A protein has these predicted regions:
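Short acidic capping loops at alpha-helix termini that bridge into adjacent secondary structure
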Residues: 55-56, 87-91, 141-146
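Secondary-structure junction motif
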Residues: 59-78, 128
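Short beta-strand elements in bilobed, periplasmic/extracellular small-molecule ligand-binding domains
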Residues: 77-100
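Hydrophobic alpha-helical segments within soluble ligand-binding/sensing domains
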Residues: 34-59, 74, 99-108, 127, ...
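Flexible loop/turn connectors
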Residues: 107-108, 112-183
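Flexible loop/hinge segments that line or gate small-molecule binding clefts
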Residues: 2-44, 125, 151-163
Length: 183
């Protein structure tokens, strides 16, 4: 799991030790990269909201320099295009992948005065923060605004009400990474 190391740093480390990275695409000697289809996660989350009848779907985006975030946003935009809906840039708020960032992003959306009936958060942690912001403002989930995250963190099932999330095969990815290390 690479965190915020850039590709150059990973390739340099791999010169001394074969490594496996998950969650990114990287072509370098002695590096095995295992990537998930993040675009599909954003697409599925947005399609779900569209299937519920939502047409004004906000997006709490992840960091602009993070591949997972940009790919999930691309999936959000593709789902809107396929539904014949314009991308409402005023409904896209940049954030990080943290609860506090989701809370701040939702506050910006609510303060903007823009109407929306649903939110696609780039990950579950951002969605948790967004839910807290809505709760503090008296906005009821899902009665007033629906929200979908990505990752299927264990806490999603224990939120009130349980949060809809797109499952990422994290366990399976970790098994594949471990297997790649020993083969």
């Amino acid at each position: 799991l690479t965190g915020h190391l850039d590709d150059r740093q990973i390739a340099e480390f791999a010169r001394h030790q074969p490594i496996v990275v998950t969650g990114r695409r990287l072509d370098a000697p002695q590096v095995r990269a295992l990537a998930l289809d993040q675009e599909a996660g954003g697409y599925l989350a947005t399609r779900h909201l569209l299937s519920l009848g939502h047409r004004r779907i906000a997006h709490i985006a992840g960091p602009a320099d993070h591949t997972d975030a940009t790919e999930r946003r691309a999936g959000y935009e593709r789902a809107l295009r396929e539904a014949g809906l314009p991308l409402a840039r005023e409904l896209v708020v940049q954030s990080d992948f943290m609860e506090s960032g989701g809370l701040l992003a939702m506050n910006r959306l609510l303060d903007s005065g823009q109407s929306f009936t649903a939110v696609f958060a780039a990950n579950d942690q951002s969605a948790f923060g967004a839910r807290m912001a809505m709760y503090r403002r008296g906005v009821r989930v899902p009665d007033d605004v629906s929200i979908v995250g990505v990752d299927d963190l264990p806490g999603a099932a224990y939120a009130t009400p349980p949060m809809t999330t797109v499952r990422q095969p994290i366990y399976e990815s970790a098994l594949a990474a471990a297997h790649a290390l020993v083969t």
